[in-house]
Amino acid sequence: MNDDILQAVYRVILERKANPSEQSYTASLMAKGIDKILKKLGEEATEVVIAGKGGAREEIIYETADLFFHTLVLLGYCDINPDEIYDELRRRFGMSGIAEKESRDR
């Protein structure tokens, strides 16, 4: 798996946040705040679900890319580096779902 593209997109998102432009979709989302970002993220998640139900491979890929992008926008807005997400996934890797859930409940 190649996470370089995710880091590259994340860097652009941070650049748009730091130096907003009227021409930037990302900057416009950031300017509208967390509620708009969350609304868009929810819409994209729903579109992934619909694409998954439809089963069309290309549609699933397209909509998942949108979901990843908008997730990165949320992370950028909240100053969370994707590396923190990767670290959490590494922590969970090899752990059963039941064991992972129990570790959260303590």
Curated annotation (Swiss-Prot):
Family named by the database record: Belongs to the PRA-PH family.
Gene Ontology CC annotations of this record: cytoplasm
Catalytic activity: 1-(5-phospho-beta-D-ribosyl)-ATP + H2O = 1-(5-phospho-beta-D-ribosyl)-5'-AMP + diphosphate + H(+)
EC number: 3.6.1.31
Cellular compartments annotated: Cytoplasm
Coiled-coil ranges per UniProt: none
HAMAP family recorded: HisE
Pfam families cross-referenced by the UniProt entry: PRA-PH
Record-given protein name: Phosphoribosyl-ATP pyrophosphatase
Keyword Amino-acid biosynthesis: yes
Broad class of the protein's primary localization: cytoplasm
Taxonomic path: Bacteria, Pseudomonadati, Thermodesulfobacteriota, Desulfuromonadia, Geobacterales
Biological process terms in GO annotation: L-histidine biosynthetic process
Gene Ontology terms, MF aspect: ATP binding; phosphoribosyl-ATP diphosphatase activity
Pathway per the UniProt entry: Amino-acid biosynthesis; L-histidine biosynthesis; L-histidine from 5-phospho-alpha-D-ribose 1-diphosphate: step 2/9
Source superkingdom: Bacteria
NCBIfam families according to UniProt: histidine_hisI, PRK00400.1-3
Endoplasmic reticulum recorded as keyword: no
Assigned keywords, A-Z: Amino-acid biosynthesis, ATP-binding, Cytoplasm, Histidine biosynthesis, Hydrolase, Nucleotide-binding
